[in-house]
């Protein structure tokens, strides 16, 4: 199993797949944790998954619970507001918590790196992939050298500018936010 993207989604996905017994290759074009916080929020449902790997309490201790969430367009015109109670939800975890992405990635990466059936290749940019029927040919560039892998599956967790999504012609609703 190959996973493109070593951010919060890709790293957690790799843990889940490894837990199901898959040998996982995790590739990312960058090295280290994200220097900026693009993901900032998680909820009780996701905390249940973090708990599976012993991370929920650590994330909660290093986060802040929030009562109100406001979604807006680039022009700051409101799209939706949600008010919820503070404290634990019916799932036993806080409804919403704000976290700092580089810190959260560090917590998850510690667990990823402890797994024998997860291999990580950073500075490895996915440049192409091809469906070969029962497997996927994965083509990457690492230090200007082309590398090819075969994998049963490829999961794209490579963010908003996802190469995987674009190659598969999967639409993205873009609200036009400047990520800088």
Give the predicted meaning of each segment.
Residues 1-26:
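N-terminal Rossmann-like FAD-binding beta1-loop-alpha1 element of flavoenzymes
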Residues 29, 42, 160:
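Short beta->alpha hinge that forms the Motif I/post-I loop of the SAM-binding pocket
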Residues 31-33:
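Helix N-cap at the beta1-alpha1 junction of Rossmann-like dinucleotide-binding domains, i.e.
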Residues 36-113, 130:
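Active-site-adjacent segment of FAD-dependent monooxygenases/related oxidoreductases
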Residues 122-137:
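A conserved short coil-to-beta-strand element within the FAD-binding core of flavoproteins
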Residues 144-153, 157:
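Core beta-strand elements of the Rossmann-like FAD/NAD(P) dinucleotide-binding domain
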Residues 156-170:
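Flavin (primarily FAD) binding-site architecture
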């Amino acid at each position: 199993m190959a996973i493109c993207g070593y951010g919060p989604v890709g790293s957690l996905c790799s843990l889940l797949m490894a837990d199901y017994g898959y040998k996982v290759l995790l590739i990312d074009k960058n090295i280290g944790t994200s220097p900026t916080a693009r993901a900032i929020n998680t909820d009780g449902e996701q905390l249940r998954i973090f708990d599976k790997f012993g991370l929920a309490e650590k994330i909660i201790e290093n986060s802040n619970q929030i009562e109100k969430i406001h979604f807006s367009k680039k022009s700051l015109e409101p799209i939706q507001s949600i008010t919820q109670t503070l404290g634990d939800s019916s799932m036993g975890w806080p409804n919403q918590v704000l976290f700092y992405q580089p810190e959260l990635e560090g917590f998850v990466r510690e667990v990823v790196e402890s797994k024998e059936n997860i291999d990580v290749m950073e500075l490895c940019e996915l440049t192409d992939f091809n469906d070969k029927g029962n497997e996927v040919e994965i083509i990457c560039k690492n230090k200007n050298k082309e590398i090819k892998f075969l994998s049963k599956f490829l999961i794209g967790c490579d963010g908003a500018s996802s190469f995987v999504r674009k190659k598969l012609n999967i639409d993205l609703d873009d609200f036009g936010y400047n990520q800088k």
